[in-house]
Amino acid sequence: MSTFFMFGKYTQEALNSISAVRTRKAVNMIQKLGGRVKSVYALLGNNDLVFIVSLPNAAQATVASIALTKMTGISFTTSIAIPAEEFDKQFNHNKN
């Protein structure tokens, strides 16, 4: 499983529909795709929220991002999170 950060930006319509029920539906949808929601945070700044999720692969992350946008009206940008240890190892491996 890989970790993904799914950053969301509310539209006015999505903002007006904030609810715990919608959040639970989003979590359930990720689980149906074979994933697990590690955390969900509301943010201040450029993004309004972030889902930190584990999913089998980038293809499933893409499906989840599109499905969440369709379900919630929230625009999502999804990024894979690479553990620093793994990133350092790959970087040093490619330097040689």
Predicted regions and their residues:
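A compositional/biophysical signature of low hydrophobicity enriched in polar/charged and small residues
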Residues: M1-N96
